[in-house]
C-alpha cells in the first residue's frame, strides 16, 4: 500500500509539473574581472560577471516546475561548477544547470527546477551571479561565424530572455589592441571537451597572396592535433577582436597528423586572408606550447618567412552564487467586500523574513435562477466571519414568435429580432421559391465567355444568357494521291476546337546543305504550301576556325575568311588599324615608379599609366593677423618637394597643472592645431611611492593605493594569491645536494629545484651464455649506488701442461680480458729419476727462423756514463727495422734507420747501473726510414754453463763458431761486439759470452763497441712473450723478470726486447706471435747475425749460419 501511495505521489508531481516564465526579472550588473593577464576588456576574455535578479512566488510556482534563461552570444561559463542554486537566507529554492553553447550553439542556457522548499505561502527573491565569456568568433565553424557579428567595440546592449520576459543591460567592450595587419593567433578552452580550439590567421597582404605555408605543431610533445575538427578558409574581413567574420573556400593543400597541421596555398585574391583552426588536446590545457609556421609571399612582394613559438596559459575560474530574501504571505478574512494587501513592519538589518498580509472578504456562494422577463436581479444572503454568504442571481429569458415568408434566394435564412422592452422576440424565416429558368447560348465577338441571368418576378421565368467566344480552329493540310484539293470543316461544341482538313496533291522538293553551330548533322524537311516547293535542309557542323588579328598601316579594319574544305580549318584574318594611345601620370603609395600599358580592343584607345611616388610635402604653418585661416599648396614637378603653406589666426590658451614622474617641475606649452586651444602644461613632481607586495589567502589579486598628503609618501599595496609550486629533481657535478626555490611572478608557478650529487657507480662484469656483449645501467635513487652490469660472451680456452719440482699437481687459470683467450696451466710433478736424468735444463727452439715474421720493430738504446762528481752523460740510439716476408716466409731486413742523441747532465737518468756505471733503457719510437743494404757480420760466440745446487756436473764450454762476412766494398770499418749473458733459473745459472764482429754502413766510428748482456730469471717455467691485449693494455708476462744491461752506440745484432723494470717485461713482437722459450728469444735476438743458436740438454750451442748467411747475401743483391 505504501509503495502504491509513493508511486501515486510521484505520478501526481510529474503530472502537475509545468514550465513557468519570468522568474529572472532584472539585469542588475555586468562587470569584468581579469582572469589572467589580458590587455583589454573584450567580450571573449574571461571573466564577465552577470548579476541577475530573480523571483519565485509559491502561489504560481510549484516544486518540480522548470524555467529557462536563454543567453544569446554566450560561449561558456568560466567556472568549474556544473550548476548554481537560487538561495535566500541559505535555503535552496531552485537548482539551475549550466548548458554552455561553446562550439555547438550560438547561445548558452540556464535550465532551472523549483525545489520542494517552495510552498504557496512563500515568495523568494534574490540575485544570482554568473561568471561567463561571450562568443565573438574564433574559428571557421558556422556557430563562431554567426556569433562573430554579435557585438562591436564600444557600447553594446546585452539581452537575456526568460520566456517572454527580456532583461537587458548596456556594457562597453574594448577593441583588441593587437595590430590586425600582423599574424593573428587565438586559443580558447572548450570545457565540455577538455580541448582547445586554436586559430591562426596569416599576416595581411593588401593586394592578395601569391603563395604561402602556415600552420602549427606541438613543441615539446605535450599537444596532439585533432585532424577531424579542422577549418581552413579565407575571410573577407575581421571583427573588432581580429576573428574571421566569413569563410570561403580556396585552393590549398593540407597536411595533418597528431603532431601538427599545415596548409600550403596559392593565389589568394586581394581583400582576403587565409586562416586555419583546429581542436588540440594538451597534457595540460592551461599550459602548453605551439610552434607556428609562417611563410608567405604577398602579390607584388617578396617571400617572407617568420616562424614563431607561443606558450599558452589558462585563466582562473570564478564561482557562481546566489542570495536573496524570503517573503511569507498570510491571509486574514475581514468583513470588507474587496481584497486588500498590507505589509507588516520589516527591518532588513534585523529581520530575515518579510511578511505580507492579505485581507480577504467573507467567501460567497453564487446561486443562479431564471425567469421570463427583461432585467437581471442580484440578492445577497449575509453570513458571519468564518461562514459562507450566498449570492442569488436571477437571469431573465424571452419567448419567441416565428414568421415565415418566401424569397428568390436559393437558401433558407433565419433572423431573430430581440425586443428590448418586452419578453417576446420575433423569428423571421425566409424560404427560397425559384422561378423556372431558360438558358440561351450564343457566340459573340469577344475572346471571353459571359453568363447573364435575367430574373423575372416571382412566378415568372428567369433567363440565363451564355455568350461564348468563337471556337479555335485547327487547320490540317495533308497530301493525298489525287491531283486536286479538298477542304472539310468539323465544328466542335462551344469552347472546343473546330477542325479544317485540307487535302493537297504532293509538292516538288529542293535539297539545300548548310553549316550550323552544332557538332552533329541534321536533316530538316520544310513543307511549302500546297502548290509550292518543299525544302530539305541538311545542316552540317562547321569547320574549326582560327582567328588571327593583326595591325596594319591602313586606317580601316578588314576581315577576310579563308574557307577550307569540309573537315578542315577555316581562317579568319582580322586586320585592325593601330589604336590611339593616351598617357596618364598619377601618384600612388609606393616608393618607386611603374609604367603599365593597358591594351584596349581594336578601335579603342590604349592607356599608358605612369605611377609616380608622391612628392614629399613640407607643410609650413604660420600665424598672421587675420581672423581666418588660409591654405596654399605649391606643387613642385615630380620628384621634388611640394609645399603647403597654412596661415592661421592665433589660438586661445588654457593652463593645466598635473603631476608627473620627474623630481622637478616643468612648464610645457602644447600648441594645438590652428583654430583650437593651446595648452600650457605645468608638471609637478609626484609624491614618493612605496609598493608592497604580499600574499594572502584569497584566490584573486587586489591593488590598493593609499594616497598621502602632498609631499608625503603614497603606498601601493598589492595582494597576490599564492603561486602553485612544481618540484624538479636533477643531478649535478657537485658532491652535495642543494634546494633552490625560483619564485615566479604572481599568478604563475614557482619552481623548487633540487640538485643531487651523482650516485657512485659500481661496474660488474660477468659472463653469460649469449654470443654478444650487453651493458645495462641500473639507476638507484639519489644518494645510493648505480650499477653498470656488463655481460660478456665466454672467452675461448687454451690448456698448457708443465712439469715442476713439487710433489703435487695443480692447475691455474689465467683469465684474459673479455674477447681474449683464457689459459689453463696444469703444473704436473716429476719422479726423482726424472729429475736426476733431467740434470740440465733443456731448451728447444720450436720456432725456426723462416716461421717467425716481424713486420715493424723500433728500438732505442741509451748509453749512460757517470764519472764521480762530474755528473752523467748519455747517448740514445733509435733503430727501426721493417721486414717483409718473401714467398718462403723468410724474414728479410729491407731498411734500417738509426738516430743518435747525445745528452749530459749532472744527474743520472733513471735506470739500472752496472758496476762500470753504464745503463741501458729501451723503448719504442717511430723515426723516418731510409733504405740501405744490410751487411753480413762475422760472429764469434762462446757459451759457458755453470750449475749450482743439486746439479754438480760443473761448467760446460761450447765450441766457437766463426762466421766471416763477405765485406762490402763500401764498408769502412767493422764493429766487434762481445756479449756475456748470465741467466739464473732457480738453483741453476747459465752464463753465455760471445763476441760479434760486424760491419756497419750507418755509424761512422773507428772505435770498437763492447756490449754486456745480463739476464736473470727466477723460475724454470717457460718464459712467455708479453703481448698487448685487445683492450690496449699491457698483458702480464710469465713468472720471469728479466733484466738487461747493455753498452753500445750502435747495435745491429741484439733485437730482442730489454727492460729496466724488475717486475714486468715489454716486447715489440706482434700480438699474434707464438709464445717462445728463452732459446727462442736468443734466436730472435741474433737474427741480424744471420745465424740460429739452439741450446740443447747438454749445454752445447748449435749454430746454423753458413747457409743462412749465403741466403741473405743472395737476397741482398736484389734489394
Curated annotation (Swiss-Prot):
What GO cellular-component annotations does this UniProt entry give?
A: cell surface; extracellular vesicle; hyphal cell wall; plasma membrane; side of membrane; yeast-form cell wall
**Where are the annotated ALS repeats, by residue?**
365-396, 401-432, 438-469, 474-505, 510-541, 546-577, 582-613, 618-649, 654-685, 690-721, 726-757, 762-793, 798-827
Note the pro-peptide positions.
1099-1119
Q: Which cysteine-cysteine pairs are annotated as disulfide bonds in the entry?
A: 73-150, 96-112, 205-298, 227-256
Can the keyword Lipid biosynthesis be found in this entry's annotation?
no
Domain remark in the UniProt entry: Each ALS protein has a similar three-domain structure, including a N-ter domain of 433-436 amino acids that is 55-90 percent identical across the family and which mediates adherence to various materials; a central domain of variable numbers of tandemly repeated copies of a 36 amino acid motif; and a C-ter domain that is relatively variable in length and sequence across the family.
What is the protein's name according to its record? Answer: Agglutinin-like protein 3
List the gene name: ALS3
